[in-house]
Amino acid sequence: MNRRKFLSLTGGGIIVAATATVGTIASRTPALALAPWDQAGVIYDEPRKRALSYAILAPNPHNRQPWMVDLSTPDQVVLRVDRDRLLPHTDPFSRQITIGLGCFLEVMLIAAAENGYAVDLDVFPE
């Protein structure tokens, strides 16, 4: 075997091995990252928590999840913005945060309806 053939076979083998390794790493499913989607609607018996388990998966700006939920009153969910998660530099008027909270509410409404519950939504209560 001459030197040129040896180098081409060795180089080709390295490329094939590297490609296989990258392909394996890129195609792995992160079980821990997907756990919330597997558990949504399953681990809670209480209807509010069941609907909220879906709502927390709602799309939100920069994955900040800017919501706080108060369940202290029976049969009521109070949604508030977590001011520590605002984006003052990229979203000075909180437009993106408002859209994210709207997505949260819509997913909660859909999840509640799917389980046979109606939601009376009072936006911006006093």
Can you annotate each of these PLM segments?
Residues 1-126:
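Acidic, surface-exposed loops and disordered segments
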